Amino acid sequence: LCDQVHSGSYRPQPVRRAYVPKADGAQRPIGIPALEDKIVQGAVAEVLSAIYEVDFLGFSYGFRPGRSPHHAVDALNAALIKRKINWVLDADVRRFFDSVDHEWLLRMVAHRVADPRILRLIRQWLLAGVLESGKWFKTLEGTPQGAGISPILANIFLHYSLDLWVHVWRQRCANGEVIIVRYCDDFVMGFEKPTDAESMMGDLKRRLSKFGLGLNEKKTRLLEFGRFAAERRKRRGMRRPETFDFLGFTHYCCMNRKGHFFVMRKTQRARMIRKLKALRTEARLRMHWPLRKQQRWLAAVLRGHYGYYGYLGNSRALSNFAYQVRKLWFRALCRRSQKNAMTWERFNRLLKVFPLPVPRIVRT
């Protein structure tokens, strides 16, 4: 494989198209590359990451070394609390991975990468096509989600098309404070002045359209949010401030015990419903497994859930998720045997022998 890459005889295979459910009920297409392509893409991704890591801006968090969704959530939380933010732009780029313009992307990569072999490999991957239901389809635009090279290519594309532009815009055009936190194609902006927020909406649409991108109008919202939002809305006879979702969390305004403004996070409802639905399907498939094996599987699921969503203030959602997991296990065991009917009393005794982890707060 190494010799093929160096000699130029390497030819990538089309990616296999599959679909995974999204939080809104739609299907997200992903591309599954062949093993050889995964290996080569992984090597090239490491090279590109080493080159571009020094260029990427501080508010970009997705798929970067030493950064995680929690770093992005914490950075957003700190900015909303400590900075003068009164308005939030919850932006959603429409079908980003399917809409990446190949020529723009290759020009952006060539800005920092002079090796023609790297550029040729990237072009080959972009044009390899997809296999769906046994049929081959051309890929004239986009980079498939699921491919090992796609995250770094997405960051490069958004670095030039969005990040650098926003950085200059808030220095030259804004009249008040402006913050942004981006995780791959998901980003949130905060504004001190409503005029800045409204100007950004128009300018952002024009900027993205230049690169073949656009905002999802149904999911992109400008909302009043911040330390004074509740008081101002109350004076106008309006309800409490709206909430917004980012990286699986619903963010909302509140006051702590000392009366200071705080931003709390809870599990995004749509995400939890989708996860429980998938677990119910899995539980039916595993209902004839030995009880110890089932318990280990569900315990791992719960620990992973607590590890991601275990923020201070999210106890109710964590407890609800734990209850729903116990409930779906109970129902799966009820289907397992018609002779020895499972009751809640018997199930609770079983939980003492095969306990499940209790909700834990692991992040503040």
List PLM regions with ranges.
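Non-catalytic terminal/accessory segments
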Residues: 1-364
